[in-house]
Amino acid sequence: SQVWRRVRLRNSETAPLHASMRRAVEHRGLMAIAIGDLGVANSTTVALSALDRGWTLYAHTPTRGVALDETSADESLVAPVWKALAVLHGHQISHGDLRGKEITVDVGDDDATALFGGFGSAEYGATNVLLQADIAALLVTTTAIFGAEAAVRAAIAEFDEDTVLS
């Protein structure tokens, strides 16, 4: 009953994001479609289907672009990454997993476009806390790749200074 008392007296509770693997796969596929409609997904959902034995199929196109990691430290690529995050946040979508392996850059003749993958933690209708967490995570990722000055400068160029530094 001491445990019961602690459970009952908590100020808030975070429910599991997904109740089943099927829901998790569906969520990932649907977020890929929504983010793809904004032009910043690095793959396109091809199929999403429930299968026998409780399995779920999620098929997508091959990933577009080159993974953003320490080997792609060309500072001209940092601005497109922050621009892509601003697109998500402009539609109140948080990514939730902005590590370098989930970000690719598609370099064209005239420009570069940053694209996102790995939407298992993405949220539609994200709270301000989740949006701020994205900014913090992307600051860590872009600082590790491009350096602190370039990362912060690009972040402030897309978002206002108060948003980035708060």
Language-model segments: which ranges?
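Conserved kinase catalytic-core helix
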Residues: 25-42, 66-101
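Short, contiguous strand/loop micro-motifs
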Residues: 17-19, 71-72, 125
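Conserved ATP-binding subdomain of kinase catalytic cores across diverse folds
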Residues: 1-58, 90
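A short, flexible beta-alpha/helix-coil linker loop
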Residues: 64-68, 122-123
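C-lobe/activation-segment region of protein kinase-like
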Residues: 108-166
